[in-house]
């Protein structure tokens, strides 16, 4: 019997940036999928704020993911036929909610994409597309943003830009972020780093440096 996660109990603070690291097969991606309601645990419970998401039916879980969890993926997952503005506002449209203009303006100006709103994904660089994806994740004011290798397809310059944006979302907008990454240079942007191995959390680190993180991953 394979246990992807084994007796894991962990909490994530509001307004905090947490990175999850570990070798392939360590359980980090499974943990993220369960935290985001994309997979269900075979036992145990998961809470997003005060909601036990493991007790929700499919329809309620879908609504919770749409309204209270923002997703940022390695592959951007933008709709190619929509411009940046429409991609950012898509979660609001799907929820039947009117977007808050002041919040929209604050996000696109903070992320430096106000001059790209009429551009489709094919007309933007990878870094610009990921900024749009971050803006889309922020638009619904989610309880938490879950980021799965968000810089995996980016060059080093775009990686620094996107990580700066996620850091600012935490510091300036009070956003909570949980990120899975294999990259120590990316993980040091976080307030806290969890290291997984064999389905367990083996280290829970704060104030990390690249050197201390490299040592913890050995």
Question: Which sequence ranges carry the predicted segments?
Answer:
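ABC family nucleotide-binding domain
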Residues: 1-190, 195-196, 201
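Conserved beta-strand-loop-alpha-helix hinge in the C-terminal portion
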Residues: 200-218
């Amino acid at each position: 019997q394979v246990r992807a996660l084994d007796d894991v109990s962990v909490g994530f603070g509001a307004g905090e940036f947490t990175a999850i690291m570990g070798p392939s097969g360590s359980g980090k991606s499974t943990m993220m999928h369960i935290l985001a309601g994309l997979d269900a645990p075979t036992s145990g419970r998961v809470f997003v704020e005060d909601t036990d998401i493991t007790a929700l039916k499919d329809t309620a879980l879908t609504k919770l993911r749409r309204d209270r969890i923002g997703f940022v993926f390695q592959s951007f997952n933008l709709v190619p036929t929509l411009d940046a503005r429409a991609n950012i506002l898509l979660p609001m449209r799907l929820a039947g909610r009117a977007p808050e203009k002041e919040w929209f303006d604050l996000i696109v100006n903070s992320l430096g994409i106000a001059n790209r709103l009429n551009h489709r994904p094919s007309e933007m660089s990878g870094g610009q597309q990921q900024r749009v994806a971050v803006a889309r994740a922020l638009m619904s004011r989610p309880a938490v943003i879950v980021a799965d290798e968000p810089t995996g397809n980016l060059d080093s310059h775009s990686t620094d830009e996107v990580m700066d944006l996620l850091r600012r979302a935490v510091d300036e907008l009070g956003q909570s972020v949980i990120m899975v990454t294999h990259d120590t240079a990316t993980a040091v942007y976080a307030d806290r780093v969890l290291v997984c191995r064999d389905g367990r959390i083996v280290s829970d680190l704060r104030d990390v440096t690249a050197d201390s993180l490299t040592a913890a991953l050995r």
